[in-house]
């Protein structure tokens, strides 16, 4: 799936780009993104999200997450400091992408990657200020997704059911994305996404919304 409406242009006209990579839990997108950062010959920068949850052992503020108090997060949310944010009700915590994180990367000529869920991606697409490259990663079928989630061995039946229901709803938004990647092999998925980004360096920013 791609968007033919983007026109050719000199990449120096827009050196920084926003890239959204989404996909259901269990699709392997985090692994793909980590490998993409290492292997792709594009100046990538992974956006660091903000959260109200407590740091886990070994996590570093500003590197893994920006750890904010609930009060600070709410203050910044009211100031419209987030590109997108949401509360994960099952955890009682907030997560979001700070505008200054994105702006700093774009102004430095980086291709800023947002590894965010569909809800966050739709919020970005609805903001005319951003015209991101949008990529949806999934395992090819709901059956394969269920198999991968079960193989993790970390999900209760109720949690598994909830994740699959969320994934089914997220798949309904696939048409809002410019590119679809079926992650049957991490190496192949990384190669496909890297080629997409290399091709996009020759086009003007566009979005499919």
Swiss-Prot record:
Question: Which residues are involved in binding ATP?
Answer: 23-30
What the entry lists under InterPro entries is as follows:
GK/Ca_channel_bsu, Guanylate_kin-like_dom, Guanylate_kinase, Guanylate_kinase_CS, P-loop_NTPase
Annotated ranges, domain Guanylate kinase-like: 16-198
Q: Which domain of life is it from?
A: Bacteria
Q: Which CDD domains match?
A: GMPK
Q: Gene3D superfamilies this protein is in?
A: Guanylate Kinase phosphate binding domain (3.30.63.10), P-loop containing nucleotide triphosphate hydrolases (3.40.50.300)
Q: Which reaction does it catalyse?
A: GMP + ATP = GDP + ADP
For this protein, what is the EC number? 2.7.4.8
One Pfam match: Guanylate_kin
Subcellular location(s): the record lists: Cytoplasm
Provide this UniProt record's keywords sorted from A to Z: ATP-binding, Cytoplasm, Kinase, Nucleotide-binding, Transferase
Q: Which HAMAP family match?
A: Guanylate_kinase
Give the family, as the similarity comment puts it.
Belongs to the guanylate kinase family.
Function field: Essential for recycling GMP and indirectly, cGMP.
Identify this protein by name.
Guanylate kinase
């Amino acid at each position: 799936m791609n968007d033919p409406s983007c026109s050719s242009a000199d990449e120096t006209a827009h050196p920084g780009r926003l890239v959204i990579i989404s996909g259901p839990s269990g699709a392997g997108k985090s692994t793909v993104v980590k490998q993409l950062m290492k292997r792709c010959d594009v100046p990538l920068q992974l956006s660091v999200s903000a959260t109200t949850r407590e740091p886990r052992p070994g996590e570093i503020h500003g590197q893994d997450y920006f750890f904010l108090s609930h009060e600070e997060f709410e203050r910044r949310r009211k100031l419209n400091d987030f590109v997108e944010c949401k509360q994960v009700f099952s955890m009682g915590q907030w997560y979001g992408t700070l505008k200054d994180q994105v702006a700093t990367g774009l102004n430095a000529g980086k291709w800023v990657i947002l590894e965010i869920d569909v809800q966050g991606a739709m919020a970005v697409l609805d903001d005319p200020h951003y015209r991101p490259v949008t990529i949806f990663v999934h395992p090819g079928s709901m059956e394969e997704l269920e198999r991968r989630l079960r193989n993790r061995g970390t999900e209760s039946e109720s949690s598994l059911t909830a994740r699959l229901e969320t994934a089914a709803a997220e798949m309904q938004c696939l048409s809002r994305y410019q590119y679809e990647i079926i992650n049957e092999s991490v190496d192949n998925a990384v190669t496909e996404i890297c080629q997409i980004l290399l091709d996009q360096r020759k086009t003007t920013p566009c979005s499919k919304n």
